[in-house]
């Protein structure tokens, strides 16, 4: 009955009813279009042309959702596209069904199916001219067009979809494996999560082991960089006294006084055992001290130390004399290195007014380079000759020489000689007279009394006729 009333030409009733039904149907389709425009699964929330969020128009020609700006550009194409507003127009059932079958996602597969992002670029939406040129390439020239028959339904492959970039569309979610790498545990699988505690505990223990290693490394590094750790003792303590010159054990080592003035010259002192320069006893007396020896002894000394009753105060120069002048026990004939006559008990002072035997030469001052002489004899001026019957003043006096005797080229370091070089004089109690450097081991010369005048001069700078004229020329280093 109702259907018949509507179909019938009743007065006013049928037309009004159909109009209301058409409006109701149109409202339903419009609501459906708005639902499609808000559908996020089809990518309709963003403009198909410029990817701007918030679509307001529908392109009925291609079945896509666009923004207001792009809708004006689509109308300017050739042929122009048919565009409708979502909220201000009505849609028919075929239009709604067409929009349902297309949408932005399907339109992208059709119109941008051959698009390659490596060779082509989507223009910036803020430049209308470039967007227009892009639309002309896409719709008028169909540069990247793919027939709809190849993209219908689910048969469309994902490879072609990924090859076509979507401007303004939401980027597809990438799996967490691609972002974090392969060894990523599953977040939803309960079986895998239940099996993870063991592996996590192992990983945690390994990480703790690695975290515990750096301190040990740092400690070893600290120990290795501590260069002064092995140096013992106080760095501010006084250094140990070390001799300035090394000891020469090849020449024999003798006991010498320990003084800090000079180094240990053990090279020139020897033990009673045989050495390079003969048997020399160790020195046990203070420097420049001498003990009287029995008459007739042939002991020789380096500097010919005078017999002193009391030892003088040691000093730095005295240490040298003590080190270079070793003593020898009574009865020994071998001389020292330089072979000077040793102490004489009857030695007198060279200065008038001072006791003859046992006194200090030149008073209390012991000059190792002074030349003592007899008190009754005249002064031995090195620059004038005199009538001393004794030996020369430098190195050849029978009392004691003040300087070292020049070393002749022959027999300087010979073995110990067996007989005295010179006979004893009358006033010196059988003391040997002569120098150890004068032809060691030769025959004795004739005795000469102490008061006998002779032409021997004590001036080392002048030559004179003497019994020693046959000796080789002197090599005195002070001449």
Swiss-Prot record:
<protein>
    <recommendedName>
        <fullName>Arf-GAP domain and FG repeat-containing protein 2</fullName>
    </recommendedName>
</protein>
<feature type="zinc finger region" description="C4-type">
    <location>
        <begin position="47"/>
        <end position="70"/>
    </location>
</feature>
<dbReference type="InterPro" id="IPR038508">
    <property type="entry name" value="ArfGAP_dom_sf"/>
</dbReference>
<dbReference type="InterPro" id="IPR037278">
    <property type="entry name" value="ARFGAP/RecO"/>
</dbReference>
<feature type="compositionally biased region" description="Polar residues">
    <location>
        <begin position="454"/>
        <end position="479"/>
    </location>
</feature>
<keyword id="KW-0479">Metal-binding</keyword>
<keyword id="KW-0862">Zinc</keyword>
<dbReference type="InterPro" id="IPR052248">
    <property type="entry name" value="Arf-GAP_FG-repeat_protein"/>
</dbReference>
<keyword id="KW-0677">Repeat</keyword>
<dbReference type="GO" id="GO:0005096">
    <property type="term" value="F:GTPase activator activity"/>
</dbReference>
<feature type="domain" description="Arf-GAP">
    <location>
        <begin position="27"/>
        <end position="153"/>
    </location>
</feature>
<feature type="compositionally biased region" description="Low complexity">
    <location>
        <begin position="194"/>
        <end position="218"/>
    </location>
</feature>
<feature type="compositionally biased region" description="Polar residues">
    <location>
        <begin position="157"/>
        <end position="167"/>
    </location>
</feature>
<comment type="subunit">
    <text>Interacts with EPS15R.</text>
</comment>
<keyword id="KW-0007">Acetylation</keyword>
<dbReference type="GO" id="GO:0008270">
    <property type="term" value="F:zinc ion binding"/>
</dbReference>
<keyword id="KW-0863">Zinc-finger</keyword>
<feature type="modified residue" description="N6-acetyllysine">
    <location>
        <position position="174"/>
    </location>
</feature>
<feature type="region of interest" description="Disordered">
    <location>
        <begin position="450"/>
        <end position="479"/>
    </location>
</feature>
<feature type="region of interest" description="Disordered">
    <location>
        <begin position="150"/>
        <end position="223"/>
    </location>
</feature>
<dbReference type="InterPro" id="IPR001164">
    <property type="entry name" value="ArfGAP_dom"/>
</dbReference>
<dbReference type="Pfam" id="PF01412">
    <property type="entry name" value="ArfGap"/>
</dbReference>
